[in-house]
Amino acid sequence: MSRILKPVAAQDVKYLHQICAQYFMGERAFRIAEYNLGNTFTGSIDLLASDDTTVYLITINIADFADALLRAFTGYRWFRENRDFLQRIYPPEVIDIGLQVQLIILSQDFPPEIPSIVDEVCSVPVGLYRYRLFGSAQDPDIFIEEIQRPGKTLPFQDEEPDTLRTRLGIEAANLSDDDIREFLSAMRA
């Protein structure tokens, strides 16, 4: 018997920010320095994060993608204009504001042409991540995957279902090989 996970809508924006931050800390080893930096008029950043080489300005879309794209760009402009000020506020051991910058946009849906557009138009790297919320609206679970650019290989593309079960720690779910393949293809669609 397969367990059906039903998509749910985000009810609590702060909670969505927290679970996205947990993903980036756990899966990408980012350090989160700040939540909700800036404001809607001059530019805002949902999550200010970094690793050893890059500062990430993360925008989490809960509505229209065009609005999220504009928020990401105005947040980047605000960050650039206030970089000296931010370096005085945040000590380097918390976040090194002088590192290279990458924008990250999380969204449930993307226009199909957006990866090639941001690659061609933007002077700063832009990472695109799709997220899905499952479970209940009061306590959702999240699935996040990076949108692959042409020429990149998809994660788990060539792995056998048994290898994936072990790697993802889902042996106890008793999912069949077909269930795993179906889920992966649905998430990539």
Annotate each language-model stretch with its function.
Residues 1-189:
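Charged, terminal alpha-helix-loop-beta segments
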